[in-house]
């Protein structure tokens, strides 16, 4: 099992969710996050003073998948989230040792 984490632009969330559903992937967590990378921040004017906004709003999607679904998920995310502009985001894949469904006690891939 693998955990796939994708950090994307917030306005791309619906497209990414639909692409994942069309690929047969269900069950994900969505977290509002802030961050910066090469995109950096921008300046804003507030009550006559200029402020540097370092952290930009992003959305983090997390899902745990069987190994054979990881490439499918990555293709769906990249296809739906790409704008070809700086700040499109990143995808991280890591190994998961164990998963347990609390309600039933199922473990492993049966739990996801």
Curated annotation (Swiss-Prot):
Q: Which UniProt keywords apply?
A: Nitrogen fixation, Nucleotide-binding, Phosphoprotein, Transcription, Transcription regulation
Molecular functions per Gene Ontology: ATP binding; enzyme regulator activity
Whether Manganese counts among this entry's keywords is: no
Q: Name one GO biological process term.
A: nitrogen fixation
Q: Which family does it belong to?
A: Belongs to the P(II) protein family.
Quaternary structure and interacting proteins, as annotated:
Homotrimer.
Q: What is the role of the protein in this entry?
A: P-II indirectly controls the transcription of the glutamine synthetase gene (glnA). P-II prevents NR-II-catalyzed conversion of NR-I to NR-I-phosphate, the transcriptional activator of glnA. When P-II is uridylylated to P-II-UMP, these events are reversed. When the ratio of Gln to 2-ketoglutarate decreases, P-II is uridylylated to P-II-UMP, which causes the deadenylation of glutamine synthetase, so activating the enzyme.
Write the protein's name.
Answer: Nitrogen regulatory protein P-II
Q: Which organism is it from?
A: Rhodobacter capsulatus (Rhodopseudomonas capsulata)
């Amino acid at each position: 099992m693998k955990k796939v984490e994708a950090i994307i632009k917030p306005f791309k969330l619906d497209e990414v969710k639909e692409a994942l559903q069309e690929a047969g992937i269900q069950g994900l967590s969505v977290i509002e996050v802030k961050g910066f990378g090469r995109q950096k921040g921008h300046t804003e004017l507030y009550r006559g003073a200029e402020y540097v906004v370092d952290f930009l709003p992003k959305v983090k999607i997390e899902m745990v998948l069987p190994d054979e679904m990881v490439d499918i998920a990555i293709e769906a995310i990249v296809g739906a989230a790409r704008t070809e502009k700086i700040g499109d985001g990143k995808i991280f894949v890591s190994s998961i040792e164990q998963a347990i469904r609390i309600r039933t006690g199922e473990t492993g891939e049966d739990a996801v």
